[in-house]
Amino acid sequence: MAEVPELASEMMAYYSGNEDDLFFDVDGPKQMKCSFQDLDLCPLDGGIQLQISHEHYNEGFRQAVSVVVAMEKLRKMLVPCPQIFQDNDLSTLIPFIFEEEPVFLDTRNNDACVHDAPVRSLHCTLRDAQLKSLVMSGPYELKALHLQGQDLEQQVVFSMSFVQGEESNDKIPVALGLKAKNLYLSCVLKDDKPTLQLESVDPKNYPKKKMEKRFVFNKIEINNKLEFESAQFPNWYISTSQAESMPVFLGGTRGGQDITDFTMQFVS
């Protein structure tokens, strides 16, 4: 039986020598050519076309068989697909790599995450509907009075922090601390009555995203005026008196003799 020569013998004589353009010729000039660049071997069922030059009909059987062997070897060689791999191609592979499973979040134990959340704050001053400013009256009390000129420097600057609470379209939960002081407005029950007070806190722990409910007020905006409703005692509001230099307190009526409307001025 006749032995078919390997590619390294006769076929190398017809090899072009260019790695980027591999082809085999029957004889001399490129009469018959099979280039890697011309073959897209990505489809497994794709065939290879073999072009025969009839001018070389007198070539020997060994050379003809060598060409066929070379073509078969080229056909079996793994040639990269020229198509560029894109992001959408990766998305088709993900379902085969990862298995989708539902994730259940236990919201009962998320206090630590809420505590670590950053707190957004701003500095501001507040004046009631009669343009009375809020100033300190003793170490733990605020009062409302009219200020003018240089006396305006006496008014309290609040650090308003946006905290966790029952937020809605018209209510934004906030905490009201005094700037540069470890004091926060809080609502507690004294003598069976909701009462407003200034409470001292540890600056290492305050402000925080999840404040205790006694520190939380629902900021409500109505006709460019602000109201501050106690989250601990609904329908009770930060209030001032019609009279001058009276303490700021927690009142249970709106639109009556007590003033519950305020304007806010931002402070840099």
Curated annotation (Swiss-Prot):
GO biological process, one term: fever generation
UniProt protein name: Interleukin-1 beta
Subunit and interaction comment: Monomer. In its precursor form, weakly interacts with full-length MEFV; the mature cytokine does not interact at all. Interacts with integrins ITGAV:ITGBV and ITGA5:ITGB1; integrin-binding is required for IL1B signaling. Interacts with cargo receptor TMED10; the interaction is direct and is required for the secretion of IL1B mature form. Interacts with HSP90AB1; the interaction facilitates cargo translocation into the ERGIC. Interacts with HSP90B1; the interaction facilitates cargo translocation into the ERGIC.
Propeptide intervals in chain numbering: 1-116
A GO molecular-function annotation: interleukin-1 receptor binding
Family to which the UniProt record says this protein belongs: Belongs to the IL-1 family.
Subcellular location: Cytoplasm, Cytosol; Secreted; Lysosome; Secreted, Extracellular exosome
A GO CC term attached to the entry: cytosol
Site entry: Important for interaction with integrin: K171, K179, K181, K190, K204
Additional information: IL1B production occurs in 2 steps, each being controlled by different stimuli. First, inflammatory signals, such as LPS, stimulate the synthesis and promote the accumulation of cytosolic stores of pro-IL1B (priming). Then additional signals are required for inflammasome assembly, leading to CASP1 activation, pro-IL1B processing and eventually secretion of the active cytokine. IL1B processing and secretion are temporarily associated.
CDD domains: beta-trefoil_IL1B (cd23296)
Keywords from the UniProt entry: Cytokine, Cytoplasm, Inflammatory response, Lysosome, Mitogen, Pyrogen, Secreted
Origin superkingdom: Eukaryota
Organism this protein belongs to: Macaca fascicularis (Crab-eating macaque)
Function: Potent pro-inflammatory cytokine. Initially discovered as the major endogenous pyrogen, induces prostaglandin synthesis, neutrophil influx and activation, T-cell activation and cytokine production, B-cell activation and antibody production, and fibroblast proliferation and collagen production. Promotes Th17 differentiation of T-cells. Synergizes with IL12/interleukin-12 to induce IFNG synthesis from T-helper 1 (Th1) cells. Plays a role in angiogenesis by inducing VEGF production synergistically with TNF and IL6.
Keyword Disulfide bond found: no
